[in-house]
Amino acid sequence: MSTESMIRDVELAEEALPKKAWGPQNSSRCLCLSLFSFLLVAGATTLFCLLNFGVIGPQREEKFPNNLPIIGSMAQTLTLRSSSQNSSDKPVAHVVANHQVDEQLEWLSRGANALLANGMDLKDNQLVIPADGLYLVYSQVLFKGQGCSSYVLLTHTVSRFAVSYEDKVNLLSAIKSPCPKETPEGSELKPWYEPIYLGGVFQLEKGDRLSAEVNLPKYLDFAESGQVYFGVIAL
């Protein structure tokens, strides 16, 4: 029932009352009727406002139907947590050179800054891939010498021995020469340093073996840790 209808009913009720001479009793009745009419109109108006603004009555479901925003936020959080957990389970290896051996490049998986995790293995100086997938392969060496009594050519190579074929295939390779020409006899022999860094992404198979080698290990500089290393990271 609308507010206008309720007011109209009150007015009709007042007109239907018998018109009598105004006296003390009739004045009291009119006052009570007026007060009742006012309270009725005020209550109806308040009820209409509460219903119109949704304070009472059935709630509007269009604000968050089925709690989709909350569920979506929770799903996104769970996805991010799952993604970070999966990243920590991926195979990874970082091996360093053994500085205690002379004129050879031997990799160590134990010690400072060395790491083998989640299935990676170091066997016969080669890193063994534990599962199929994309891998970041990288390696760095640092050569050091004193003068150039002869022409020096330095190479650094990362090779793959695949399960599907036994041939050795070079994945990464670089060649450098610190001495473009020989140092004349009697001249001052100046020290030289030559770093080589290799890196790339490759599709590898389970059981593949990777090696990192140099042609002249006698020139390797093991004076500082972190100068010669070899690593693989699953993507």
From Swiss-Prot:
One of its GO terms (biological process) is immune response. Glycans are attached at residues 83, 86. The soluble form derives from the membrane form by proteolytic processing. The membrane-bound form is further proteolytically processed by SPPL2A or SPPL2B through regulated intramembrane proteolysis producing TNF intracellular domains (ICD1 and ICD2) released in the cytosol and TNF C-domain 1 and C-domain 2 secreted into the extracellular space. Residues 91-235 form the THD domain. Residues 1-35 are cytoplasmic. Coiled coil: none annotated. Residues 57-235 are extracellular. The record marks 34-35, 39-40, 49-52, 79-80 as: Cleavage. SMART domains: TNF. The chain crosses the membrane at residues 36-56. Pfam families: TNF. InterPro entries: TNF, TNF_alpha, TNF_CS, TNF_dom, Tumour_necrosis_fac-like_dom. GO terms for molecular function: cytokine activity; tumor necrosis factor receptor binding. One of its GO terms (cellular component) is plasma membrane. A lipid is attached at residues 19-20 (N6-myristoyl lysine). The modification Phosphoserine is found at residue 2. Disulfide bonds join 148-179. Keywords: Cell membrane, Cytokine, Disulfide bond, Glycoprotein, Lipoprotein, Membrane, Myristate, Phosphoprotein, Secreted, Signal-anchor, Transmembrane, Transmembrane helix. It is found in: Cell membrane. It is a single-pass type II membrane protein. Cytokine that binds to TNFRSF1A/TNFR1 and TNFRSF1B/TNFBR. It is mainly secreted by macrophages and can induce cell death of certain tumor cell lines. It is potent pyrogen causing fever by direct action or by stimulation of interleukin-1 secretion and is implicated in the induction of cachexia, Under certain conditions it can stimulate cell proliferation and induce cell differentiation. Induces insulin resistance in adipocytes via inhibition of insulin-induced IRS1 tyrosine phosphorylation and insulin-induced glucose uptake. The TNF intracellular domain (ICD) form induces IL12 production in dendritic cells. Belongs to the tumor necrosis factor family. Homotrimer. Interacts with SPPL2B. This is Tumor necrosis factor. It comes from Peromyscus leucopus.
